[in-house]
Regions:
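Secondary-structure junction motif
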Residues: 125-148, 212-219
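A ligand-binding cleft/hinge motif common to bilobed small-molecule-binding domains
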Residues: 64, 81-88, 139-140, 147, ...
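Central regulatory/effector-binding core of bacterial HTH transcription factors
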Residues: 24-87, 158
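Flexible hinge/capping segments at coil-to-helix
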Residues: 21, 92-100, 104-126, 216
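Alpha-helical "hinge/linker" immediately C-terminal to small N-terminal DNA-binding modules
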Residues: 1-18, 24
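Alpha-to-beta junction loops
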Residues: 71-79, 100, 150, 168-175
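A late-sequence structural motif
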Residues: 39, 190-228
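Short beta-strand->loop
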Residues: 91-101, 176-180, 186-200
Length: 228
């Protein structure tokens, strides 16, 4: 009996030591839908390989909800997109920027082009996410259309990127999506770069200003990890 007690004490002591050294514990991540294009998977896999005893809990959400969750300690890290307005007490750690693109049904005439201009989208049926899903990104894209004198004809809104892809496959319209979504293959859907959008968007990792060791380790690894 004494040996069992001693063994239990040793295990507890070891676990506490591992937590203190950043080798054990839990990280809670809130992420937006476009991060499933490979960004999220790459980071989590790299982290699990280096810190196998650190548990990662993930929940898909929307931009505003992620920010609230960080402030309420429901999340430790939020994966969002720039541009994003930061709430007091939060800080952003930007990843490499990317361009915008369009998701097109393979039977659409634009599928024969190498790239699409913003002006080409005039009078086209478009699919985009609702403003409540990410106000900053939504407003930025609408501003981009106005810069080129285009009034976007949004015929369908969808909060999740994979839903947008499904609607494009169904012939509902053209999806305005981040470039990374081209990595996810969907039947009857192809992607083309949207001209003049280079560096307009990209992922960012949002954290509280006061970060613990586990979060700092995740951020350090994220900055060193190559995202294809």
């Amino acid at each position: 009996e004494a040996r069992k007690i001693l063994s239990g004490v040793e295990k507890t002591t070891s676990y506490v030591r591992n937590i203190h050294e950043g080798k054990a514990g839990t990280i809670k991540i809130g992420f937006i839908s476009s991060s499933i294009s490979g960004f999220l998977q790459t980071l989590v896999l790299a982290h699990r390989n280096k810190y196998p005893n650190v548990k990662i809990e993930m929940e898909q959400s929307i931009s505003n909800r992620i920010s609230d969750g960080l402030l309420e300690n429901e999340f430790d890290i939020g994966i969002e997109r720039i541009p994003v307005t930061l709430t007091a007490g939060l800080i952003a750690h930007d990843m490499p920027p990317e361009s915008g693109s369009v998701a097109i049904n393979e039977n659409h005439p634009f599928a024969k082009r190498k790239q699409v201009r913003i002006s080409d989208l005039k009078d086209q049926d478009l699919i985009f996410y609702p403003r409540w899903n990410g106000p900053d990104g939504y407003d930025d894209v609408m501003s981009m259309f106005r810069e080129y004198g285009v009034e976007p004809n949004i015929v369908q809104e969808a909060p999740a990127q994979m839903t947008i892809a499904g609607l494009v496959a169904s012939g509902i319209g053209i999806g305005v999506v981040p470039e990374c979504m081209a990595k996810i293959k969907v039947a009857n859907v192809t992607h083309r770069k949207l001209q003049c959008t280079k560096g307009r968007t990209g992922f960012t990792l949002i954290t509280r200003e006061k970060k613990d060791l586990l979060v700092n380790q995740f951020l350090d690894l994220a900055m060193m990890t190559k995202i294809d």
